[in-house]
């Protein structure tokens, strides 16, 4: 793999991991249509996930620091973060159960381009209707256990290529009456255990040995980190300004175009 190839894949991973357009769907489409493209190796996949996870940690460093110290501080803010930590754990449970139980099915779906195209259309529908029906919703302090559980199920469903993780989790929280900024923030914090879990699974599949391409892979990871930071910042602004419609249209166009090509 060349440096350019690694940087382009890192850019793709960082942008599509957090923007509501499905990173897995774009990776599958790239594999089908880009000449000479092949699925990256396990180590490269691990480093890309590490780059995007670092982007969340840096962007939400205040939240992450307080979550880490929530059970060591007695004041009221720590109590709020202890509650948020419990909600994140609740959201992670269905993701882990469904993801591990149906892993082979989701892996098989990666090669079904018509299905991926339809799932992109579904993602567009979720974004459109959640934006259209949203109201001034509940803040983080009013998130409920049921909200977290439903968001976790949505995140699990997003393992299906073409379904956006951020798009589906933000959409279901908007449908549940959560404010846009709170929904996006909770969605990104939910990504940490999900991405960490995906990284751990990849590590378990990593054959022994050190790759000579580590400097190339590291370049891809750095690009995933930088583009991940940019995409998080962009999506937070889009949600605040109620402009998810733009991503809905993008998903519809991509899904429709590639469904027509692959059918």
From Swiss-Prot:
Chief place where the protein resides: membrane
Uppermost EC category: hydrolase
Domain of life assignment: Bacteria
Keyword Cell inner membrane in record: yes
Keyword Cell wall biogenesis/degradation tagged: yes
Gene Ontology biological-process entries: cell wall organization; peptidoglycan biosynthetic process; regulation of cell shape; response to antibiotic
Keyword field: Antibiotic resistance, Cell inner membrane, Cell membrane, Cell shape, Cell wall biogenesis/degradation, Hydrolase, Membrane, Peptidoglycan synthesis, Transmembrane, Transmembrane helix
Gene Ontology cellular component list: plasma membrane
Catalysed reactions, semicolon-separated: di-trans,octa-cis-undecaprenyl diphosphate + H2O = di-trans,octa-cis-undecaprenyl phosphate + phosphate + H(+)
Membrane topology (UniProt): Multi-pass membrane protein
Residues passing through the membrane, by range: 40-60, 87-107, 109-129, 186-206, 219-239, 243-263
A GO MF label: undecaprenyl-diphosphatase activity
Subcellular location: Cell inner membrane
Its EC number(s): 3.6.1.27
Chain's role: Catalyzes the dephosphorylation of undecaprenyl diphosphate (UPP). Confers resistance to bacitracin.
HAMAP family for the chain: Undec_diphosphatase (MF_01006)
More details: Bacitracin is thought to be involved in the inhibition of peptidoglycan synthesis by sequestering undecaprenyl diphosphate, thereby reducing the pool of lipid carrier available.
Family: Belongs to the UppP family.
Name of the featured protein: Undecaprenyl-diphosphatase
Source organism: Syntrophotalea carbinolica (strain DSM 2380 / NBRC 103641 / GraBd1)
The gene coding this protein: uppP
């Amino acid at each position: 793999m060349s440096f350019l190839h690694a940087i382009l894949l890192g850019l793709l991973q960082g942008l599509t991991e957090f923007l509501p357009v499905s990173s897995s769907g774009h990776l599958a489409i790239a594999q089908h249509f880009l000449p000479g493209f092949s699925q990256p190796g396990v180590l490269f996949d691990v480093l890309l996930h590490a780059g995007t996870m670092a982007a969340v940690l840096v962007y939400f460093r205040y939240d992450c620091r307080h979550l880490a110290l929530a059970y060591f501080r007695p004041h009221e803010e720590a109590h709020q973060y202890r509650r948020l930590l419990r909600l994140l754990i609740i959201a992670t449970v269905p993701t882990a159960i469904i993801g591990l139980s149906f892993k082979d099915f989701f892996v098989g779906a990666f090669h079904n381009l018509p299905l991926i195209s339809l799932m992109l259309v579904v993602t567009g529908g979720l974004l459109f209707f959640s934006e259209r029906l949203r109201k001034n919703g509940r803040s983080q302090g009013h998130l409920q256990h049921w909200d977290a559980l439903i968001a976790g199920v949505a995140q699990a469903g997003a393992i299906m290529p073409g379904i956006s993780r951020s798009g589906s989790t933000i959409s279901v929280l908007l449908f549940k009456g959560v404010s846009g900024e709170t929904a996006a923030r909770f969605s990104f914090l939910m990504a940490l255990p999900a991405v960490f879990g995906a990284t751990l699974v990849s590590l378990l599949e990593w054959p022994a040995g050190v790759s000579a391409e580590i400097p190339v892979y590291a370049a891809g990871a750095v690009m995933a980190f930088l583009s991940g930071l940019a995409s998080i910042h962009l999506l937070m602004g889009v949600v605040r300004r109620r402009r998810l419609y733009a991503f809905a249209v993008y998903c519809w166009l991509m899904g429709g175009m590639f469904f027509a090509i692959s059918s």
